[in-house]
Amino acid sequence: MNRANWFTVSPEGAKALGGLHHFVTTGTALPPKLIHLVFLRVSQLNGCAHCIDIHTRDLLKAGMSVDTVVLVPVWHEAAYLFTDQERAALAWAEEVTRVGETHASDEAYAAAAAVFDEKDLVDLTLTIAAMNAINRMGVSFRLKPRAKPDV
């Protein structure tokens, strides 16, 4: 079934969501590689193929190795590949993305706050929230990945 092209049906809505995306990617002190890492993990949790494709490519362009990128879904078992800041961001991204289950626990907040100052933690949470919103639009309207078949 074909679904609406939400960019053309609601250009104002797309622009508003794009504005939040622009802020979190250019208006914070968070390193670009960290932002794309969070974008990728959130997209994996939400099952957004379009966003997984984009942010995998962005991480590779930002200098993260293929070996590390392929282990993002199991980062807990490959924690040694990630910095303290990356591990804290990944853990907080999972906590916030699964907020219905986790309720953004005090323990998880304290762990993130031990690594990020207050402003960066707020900006990180905005980054997570932005990608969750974008993923929900991508999945709901079936945005396709850019990847081409190997055959």
For each feature predicted by the language model, list its residue ranges.
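Hydrophobic alpha-helical segments
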Residues: M1-V151
